[in-house]
Amino acid sequence: MGHAARPGRFFGVYLLYCQNPRHRGRVYVGFTVNPARRVRQHNAGRKKGGAWRTSGRGPWDMVLILHGFPSAVAALRFEWAWQHPQASRRLTHVGPRLRSEASFTFHLRVLAHMLRVPPWVRLPLTVRWLRPDFRHELCPAPPPHMPIAFGPPPPQPLVPKRPAASEADSERRLDLGAKASCTLCARMLQDEEGPLCCPHPGCPLRAHIICLAEEFLQEEPGQLLPLEGHCPSCKKSLLWGNLVGQCHEDTEEEEVDLELEEEHWTDLLET
């Protein structure tokens, strides 16, 4: 019998646009793990899980979402900076909103600059227009490794749930892990180290994160974290953020209440 499966992880930061004639032009930036459900919550009001700032002001359209964040924390930090550009030392060059500038236009201007400065410039993000009729050219344009997409996000692949392991199974798995070695340095790999594996079929690469980072950085001297590189085993191109995200999916993690994280902490102050 096959084991149960769960959807793959999705962390997105989105931009809502208000279509209510009384509030038309208002926008809202938020974090979600499920875009379709999240926009329904916003339109249903705070009692149904929507945010305080959007409750009673709908209908709202989710017009843009960025996804591909390696973790919920990375997405939440991006969300906060997009909401509060004046408080981010990375965005001091952007400048405040102009008196003649629409809120939507201002938020796109902030976003364009965010995608061009550290630490966000090196994330494996996709900029996705859920409403193509709202599309604006970002200036400056996103980095070449960040594609522009249209329409709803593709379904997330199902990841098999790990069955509960007996003590004997756990000991056997630890013993096997102790015998595995890093492709690059030949030292032993332990399960808790979360070795990086090449996603291409048939590629035998298993490496310490530090070892593979150093290998990739040979192609990007002067950088602290790699953006991309070529697999030392199969020679195919790999995005660093995708590798790290896959590593996190394949390891046991602490349970995180993502539903609570979807409502920004500032909304919780409005009681």
From Swiss-Prot:
Family to which the UniProt record says this protein belongs: Belongs to the SLX1 family.
Coiled coil region boundaries: none
Listed SMART domains: GIYc
Descriptive protein name: Structure-specific endonuclease subunit SLX1
GO cellular component terms listed in the entry, alphabetical order: Slx1-Slx4 complex
Pfam families the record matches: GIY-YIG, SLX1_C
GO biological process annotation, one example: double-strand break repair via homologous recombination
